[in-house]
């Protein structure tokens, strides 16, 4: 075992090159005097000066690009200086932040789903109860359901501003609720718990997670970098590093792909599945902020959101909640709560949906 004292001794020895000669190093390694070269014995040869061999001159090395040593906060360290962004403002687009249009019509993805989709579904279905948090605010003296609703309602536009996927948002809420279920949190640092949960979820899901300074700037620099990093370690320890939880987003994708009959399905089926899943994601975002849906499993919420989305879009072939495998009474209860939630938050729902989903194209009154 290398200790600090041993390292100091090695540095001291390496810093004194005069104490070791080339001859001594050779003798220590089994070198015999008969194997010495004329240069080692100080004897001049026909081509060697009597003073010995001249040492080769060493020139200082210059790097083409300066390396910057800094701590990594997003999983991958940025060793080089990144180029400055273009001063031209990006052109705003009306595309959804996490559009399923790029994944649903993918024929290769449909083939992979037909091969492994059922096994993945069974695996995530078996993990639901282990990651489900019921009454996570039971032991929170300072955090109420209203505070949780405000925080998640703030995290929804934050994750859209950072162009993160819906999977990151679902995983963030799961990490947040599981941490609240086991650790009391003060109200003045509740926002820090939210952005730290978002950072952990992004490191698990996203290929380019946001940087710590970005998240701190969104909090108006109310917290320090050390506070966020320390809280990140605390959350990971409290959750025993069990981060990969089944989310609503996974079951939304699974049930939507079940709507597609085969790889050779017509484009109309793919378009309907895409529209339904997009509207269901907006409904699911509303349910994430509502504490009443904390007791329902992600697969049940996903199936009920798709059921309501099919009604709102008046699709010819609704997916139905029968694919979820739950009892009819439980499905009816969950669908009724989601229907009431949508009717009370119609304006918020239309703001969450892409611009192509106009108010007239969606029948919100069911």
From Swiss-Prot:
Location of this chain's protein in the cell:
Cytoplasm
Keyword tags: Cell cycle, Cell division, Cilium biogenesis/degradation, Cyclin, Cytoplasm
Annotated segments matching region Disordered:
18-55, 80-99
**Keyword ATP-binding among record annotations:** no
GO molecular-function term, one example from the UniProt record: cyclin-dependent protein serine/threonine kinase regulator activity
GO biological process terms held by the UniProt record: cell division; cilium assembly; G1/S transition of mitotic cell cycle; multi-ciliated epithelial cell differentiation
Signal sequence region = none
Q: Name one GO cellular component term.
A: microtubule organizing center
One Pfam entry for this protein is Cyclin_C
Q: Which family does it belong to?
A: Belongs to the cyclin family.
Chain's role: Specifically required for generation of multiciliated cells, possibly by promoting a cell cycle state compatible with centriole amplification and maturation. Acts downstream of mcidas to promote mother centriole amplification and maturation in preparation for apical docking.
Q: What is this protein called?
A: Cyclin-O protein A
Organism per entry:
Xenopus laevis (African clawed frog)
